[in-house]
Amino acid sequence: MTSVAELREQVRSLQDELAQLKGERGKTTTREKITKMSSEVVDSNPYSRLMALQRMGIVKEYEQIRQKSVAVVGVGGVGSVTADMLTRCGVGKLILFDYDKVELANMNRLFFTPDQAGLSKVEAAAKTLNYINPDVKIFTNNYNITTVESFEKFMNAIRTGGIDGSGAVDLVLSCVDNFEARMAINAACNELSLNWFESGVSENAVSGHIQFIQPGEKACFACAPPLVVAENIDEKTLKREGVCAASLPTTMGIVAGMLVQNTLKYLLKFGTVSDYLGYNALIDFFPKMGLKPNPTCDDRFCVLRQQEFAAKPKEETFEEVQQEEESPVHAENLYGIELVSETEVESAPTVPVATANTGLKLAFETPIQMEHSSAATDVIKNDDVSLDDLMAQMKAI
């Protein structure tokens, strides 16, 4: 048997090894915080390629993203990648919610690393995200939002989670993997009238979707319940011991990309935000559709928001407003590029390249294009020869 002294020595050795690893981690260079985004194109500027969107006319003012606060509920296969992308994009504030721990079984997905096994997902994610971009304010919440006590904490967190702590978050992103948590987010956002995105990946890992929900304007998650609720099935009975859902990092990465792309469009007001966008990996199919709210929805706050929306004066939609002609992004035409019609015949240059005073000469002469006449008399010669004479000539050949 191992003696107490040997066990103490092993513990001391492990403590020394842990201290050494922490010291090496601390020596890793971390950049200083940046107070203002710059478009300067230098290797040391982490925002130069993001600010290029503004220079190219895609976004009016990209730095507005630093004034946005986003809540990410669920830091798993989709949520962790979503938080990673938003951090790299420079969002002002991220609020993470999850109560699970990192496991080695999660290593088939993106973001987490084996050395983080055993840590809470929100704490492990916060450390990595702070290292990626120290400019982002990251707050963690390690609890299950579906319990009565934690639901109130969740409501308060998103109600006061604005960039300055006085208002609500700008957007809530649902990246959870169960119906109960989705319904909790739906109830909270309907009550607080907060816009949010729902996302998910199928159990066979070859399809996924995102859904944009505006309380009162678009269908909430309770307006069109999935099969497990429509047939009154207890979701917990669907899980069997020793059986787990499939998981592909590719599908989760694609769904996270769709989610963050539409999040950026919503926050920075460019492009068109998709109401519902699906993904089928088997045939690379991306279906889109609009979802209207259900007037008889079981969520009373959803019905209340519908009534409030119906009472608002109707505004012209983006499609109905005639867009003013925008000035070209690049007014200068340095290279003399011109658009030519496909049916237009190019005219020959007035000055041959070989005779132009440019020091150039033709490598070969362009053949003169033959002009084709459409008249049948130019192709067939009419000699007034009878058919019998032609037959005789053919036999004689």
Swiss-Prot record:
CDD domains, sorted: ThiF_MoeB_HesA_family (cd00757)
Binding site for Zn(2+): C220, C223, C297, C302
Keyword terms, alphabetized: ATP-binding, Metal-binding, Nucleotide-binding, Ubl conjugation pathway, Zinc
GO molecular function: ATP binding; metal ion binding; UFM1 activating enzyme activity
GO biological process: one example: protein ufmylation
Gene3D superfamilies named in the record: NAD(P)-binding Rossmann-like Domain
Cellular component GO terms, alphabetical: cytosol
Origin: domain of life: Eukaryota
SUPFAM superfamilies, sorted: Activating enzymes of the ubiquitin-like proteins
Positions with a binding annotation for ATP: G77, D98, K121, N144, N178
Enzyme active site: C244
Disulfide bonds: none
InterPro entries tied to this protein: D-isomer_DH_CS1, ThiF/MoeB/HesA, ThiF_NAD_FAD-bd, Ubiquitin-activating_enz
Similarity-based family: Belongs to the ubiquitin-activating E1 family. UBA5 subfamily.
Free-text function comment from the UniProt entry: E1-like enzyme which activates UFM1.
Protein name: Ubiquitin-like modifier-activating enzyme 5
